[in-house]
Regions:
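Basic (Lys/Arg-enriched) interaction patch that binds polyanionic ligands
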Residues: 290-323, 511, 515-518, 527-546
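Short secondary-structure boundary/capping segments
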Residues: 74, 233-235, 371-374, 423-427, ...
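Flanking helices and flexible, charged tails adjoining ferredoxin-like Fe-S electron-transfer domains
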Residues: 2-3, 272, 315-411, 549-654
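A generic secondary-structure signal
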Residues: 111, 141, 344-345, 372, ...
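Short acidic loop-to-helix transition motifs that present clustered carboxylates
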Residues: 38-44, 303, 389-393, 530
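Terminal amphipathic helices with adjacent charged low-complexity linkers/tails
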Residues: 300-339, 409, 416-419, 423-426, ...
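Flexible gly/pro/ser-rich segments immediately N-terminal to CXXCH heme-c attachment motifs
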Residues: 302-313, 501-506, 529-539, 567-568, ...
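Ferredoxin-type iron-sulfur electron-transfer modules and their immediate structural context
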Residues: 1-290, 294, 353-366, 410, ...
Length: 654
């Protein structure tokens, strides 16, 4: 918990919820105030004293703006506030909510990861394009605050009668890239206005491939958006001009985008463990495939992540098999810590049969509406809010079950990355039945119904507290949940499995060993062996792509036995003994195969001496070549030393 917090300021919101201050104090170990009824109205003096003390958290999040204003008036930091009313107190469930309130309190007072950010500067350069009339209307308004360029279709050039305060060009956008404060636009058929002369405006000759930059793009066209997941691209504002409210809102939003802003940084990337590519052969591209904004691109053996484009959905971190990508605002270690605290305080206060409900902002709104107008959440359903619910993958779901949660629900919304979430749920459910229940609820009054009618699970014989990387967490949790099983089949996109080797095709060239990004494939420096450690395999596909004999395939599975942690021999052969010194080298079958293909069949191996070179180790081969009649390192024959007699013998007068 936050060290400075020692007290809780409680309110029952005009008696609409039951708050037991004594029981809550016993469950949390914190001092609890008496239960007030109108902290935000009649008891503001109590709130001011609590803020002045600096050691009190207020159990009312709904009126946080009032509390922040009070803190500002007395020159104090804003107090810690959190909700126990909508998430716990307002419910038709007659069972005690003290364990749930204790868990929510303890979780709210945990130290949170630091949110990193960078400064983004916008000079207010705004490009507007789309319908001529709408573009000119928007440009006329925005030119008072921004540096505006209006892009019109070439056919609309004759409609320009007067231009004041902004630039007008004709053309078509070929492509665009970048993000807020740093967009780059490529135009075709670009024509600039010629300001001189009398009469109708004139335009320069059309130019293709012209490039320009801007800070803001206001898209008023009816064409496809310039960017994938365009609603997540900062600085790119798209509006339907047919809806006046949205059109006006877009103009207002664009007018505010000048100055210096903070852009959150979401992703931590460790290139050294990335399994994207090796030796120009493709391998894992999970993060590229799931990124909705196109922020992740291939860059040789690794990937590059553009922080300006990244919208922080977290899907890449969930599907990364090696842990090269981590979602910094909420890494798996933070989620596991929250699960542990919730369990500890919920069960410590006597709570039983806990359900976990993972949700985002949309889910929080549903919970609030359900609490006010419906049945609210049952007393054993503990909500946990995440900024990006796509980061809650199979490892987190399994860890929740292994730590004691009876059921785990993930509440999606209209902006959720459903494909990634369902893919992770498929893996989790293959390991443990219904480990992650993905639900979509549009009617808040129906929210409480999703927790009804579930068959009670058999009591877990043991619980665990998984820690470490996603792979380590998955293994520990899976062993806890499947104590009698060793091999669990998994779907095709799972990052766990075995390498299957066609022994007849494999020549033990070991090219797969040198390029395996996780070290799952290994060799024996003393003998021709191909070894494999299943627990380390990422199923990235690199070894299959690199194998010249197409001898490698995969089996998607999770091996929970200890054998998965050890190196097993996929193939081994007898080494070849040098015919000169007897030292072992190479693979006997390969050497014999080479001799069979070359001896007497190739000009360089037409005699037995040349063939013997293949059967020698490196040292003996060099020695034999050096002393051979056909030594490639030898110089030409040295000429005989000439004497006086040689010269005189050639004279005619001699």
């Amino acid at each position: 918990m936050v060290d400075k917090i020692e007290k809780l300021l409680l309110c029952d919101c005009e008696g609409s919820q039951k708050v037991d201050s004594t029981a809550l104090a016993d469950a949390t170990g914190l001092k609890c105030s008496k239960v007030y009824s109108e902290l935000c109205i009649k008891n503001l003096d109590i709130v001011e004293k609590a803020i002045q003390s600096g050691d009190t958290a207020i159990c009312c999040e709904q009126q946080s703006s009032i509390f922040d204003e009070i803190a500002g008036n007395i020159d104090k930091d804003s107090p810690i506030v959190f909700d126990i009313r909508d998430r716990a107190g307002w419910t038709v469930d007659k069972r005690t909510v003290v364990p749930k309130m204790a868990a929510l309190t303890a979780e709210a007072l945990m130290e949170k990861p630091i949110q990193k950010a960078k400064d983004v500067t916008s000079q207010g350069r705004c490009l507007i394009f789309g319908d001529c009339e709408s573009v000119l209307e928007a440009a006329q308004i925005l030119q008072e605050t921004l540096s505006v360029t209006a892009l019109l279709d070439p056919k609309d050039g004759d409609e320009i009668l007067n231009v004041n305060g902004f630039d007008v060009v004709l053309g078509k956008i070929k492509n665009a890239k970048g993000s807020f404060g740093n967009f780059t636009i490529v135009f075709d058929n670009l024509q600039e206005l010629v300001p001189s002369g009398r009469g109708p405006f004139k335009w320069t000759h059309a130019q293709d491939g012209a490039t320009s930059s801007c800070d803001i793009i206001l898209d008023l066209s009816k064409d496809d958006a310039l960017f994938p997941a365009s609603e997540k691209r900062d600085g790119y504002i798209r509006a339907d001009v047919g809806q006046k409210t949205k059109f006006t809102s877009a103009i207002l939003n664009a007018s505010q985008l000048q100055g210096t802003f903070e852009k959150s940084l979401y992703i931590k990337y460790e290139a050294s463990v990335c399994a994207h590519s090796r030796a120009e052969k493709p391998a894992c591209s999970n993060c590229i495939n799931v990124c909705p904004t196109g922020a992740i691109l291939s860059s040789g053996e690794t990937v590059t992540i553009d922080p300006g484009i990244c919208a922080g959905c977290g899907a890449c971190a969930a599907v990364c098999p090696s842990g090269a990508i981590e979602y910094e605002p909420g890494p798996i270690s933070w989620i596991l810590a929250r699960l542990d605290v919730i369990q500890k305080y919920y069960k410590g206060a006597g709570g039983k049969n806990p359900f976990l409900l993972v949700h985002d902002d949309h889910g929080r709104e549903l919970i609030s509406f359900s609490a006010r107008y419906g049945d609210g959440l049952p007393s054993n359903v503990i909500p946990m809010q995440l900024d990006a619910i796509a980061t809650f993958g199979h490892a987190e779901a399994l860890a929740a079950h292994a730590s004691g949660f009876e059921e785990v629900f993930l509440l999606t919304g209209p902006k959720s990355d459903t494909d990634t979430i369902l893919g992770e749920a498929e893996i989790a459910n293959a390991i443990f039945e219904n480990a992650l229940r993905v639900v979509e609820v549009n009617d808040p009054l129906e929210l409480s119904n999703i927790f009804e009618g579930l068959a009670k699970r058999a009591n877990k014989t043991q619980l665990s507290k998984p820690m470490g990387s996603r792979r380590q967490v998955t293994r520990v949790a899976s062993k806890t949940l499947n104590p009698e099983k060793e091999i669990l089949p998994l779907p095709d996109h799972a990052p766990y499995g075995a390498v299957l080797l066609d022994n007849d095709s494999c020549t033990l060239c070991l090219s797969c060993v040198s390029l395996c990004p996780s070290g799952a494939l290994g060799e024996n420096p003393d003998l021709p062996q191909l070894r494999f450690q299943e627990d380390a395999c990422l199923q990235c596909g690199l070894c299959s792509n690199i194998c010249p004999e197409n001898a490698i395939s995969y089996e998607k599975r999770l091996n929970l036995s200890n054998a998965a942690l050890e190196q097993t021999i996929l193939k081994e052969e007898e080494p070849f003994a040098c015919i000169e010194c007897g030292s072992l080298f190479g693979v006997k079958s390969s050497v014999e195969r080479i001799i069979d293909k070359l001896a007497g069949k190739h000009s360089m191996f037409s005699n037995s001496d040349a063939t013997k070179l293949i059967q020698m180790c490196d040292d003996c081969r060099i020695n034999a070549q050096y002393h051979s009649d056909n030594n490639p390192f030898a110089g030409g024959e040295r000429p005989r030393v000439r004497t006086t007699e040689d010269y005189l013998s050639k004279r005619k007068d001699h």
